Regions:
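Conserved functional hotspot residues or short segments at active or partner-binding sites
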Residues: 1-172
Length: 172
């Protein structure tokens, strides 16, 4: 079935999207930072170092400062199995407190989780930086400033702008 302009309607009555923008994926560290309120806290602790959002955007050391901040505040992303490990360690530690093999096994696993979390920052750096910039933009310029930062890199918004710039695409 098709609508009058020729758009295909799939089973269930939904219209197929003309354009599909790939999902950016999940960001466990960025989400943990957001849930903890750390973006806001970082801005509150550091806003006196900058006179405007332009100074923030020009600071090449900003992400290094933010990484130190989240490490000092013990903010980490969720790694699959992390909670299960914590529960298992609590249960086994009580029973097998002096078992060197179990303690070493937990130590190895915990080091792997720490390694995974440190790579999370690098993997998610772009989205974390966007969030830090957005929070500073909100501090200096309110919601308009925040959305100007967030939307300039948003893939869906960028695709829409691209389509609207080409009249032949959005009128077809």
């Amino acid at each position: 079935f098709q609508t009058k302009p020729g758009i295909s309607v799939v089973v269930g009555g939904c219209i197929d999207p003309d354009i599909i923008v790939k999902d950016e994926g999940s960001y466990p560290l960025a989400a943990s930072i957001l849930r903890s309120g750390a973006y806001f806290k970082f801005v509150q602790e550091n806003n006196d170092q900058y006179a405007s959002i332009d100074e923030v955007l020009a600071d090449n050391e900003l992400m290094t400062k933010f990484k130190v901040f989240i490490e000092e505040n013990d903010i980490s992303g969720y790694v699959d199995g992390q909670e299960d490990l914590k529960l298992a360690k609590e249960k086994l530690s009580k029973k097998e407190e002096k078992n060197l093999f179990i303690n070493n096994a937990f130590s190895v696993i915990e080091k792997q989780i720490e390694k995974t979390q440190s790579t999370m920052f690098e993997d998610e750096k772009e989205i974390i930086q966007r969030m830090v910039h957005g929070e500073f933009a909100f501090y200096y310029n309110g919601y308009e400033g925040r959305y100007n930062i967030y939307l300039k890199d948003d893939k869906v918004v960028q695709k829409a702008i691209e389509i609207f710039a080409d009249e032949s695409q959005y009128l077809s």
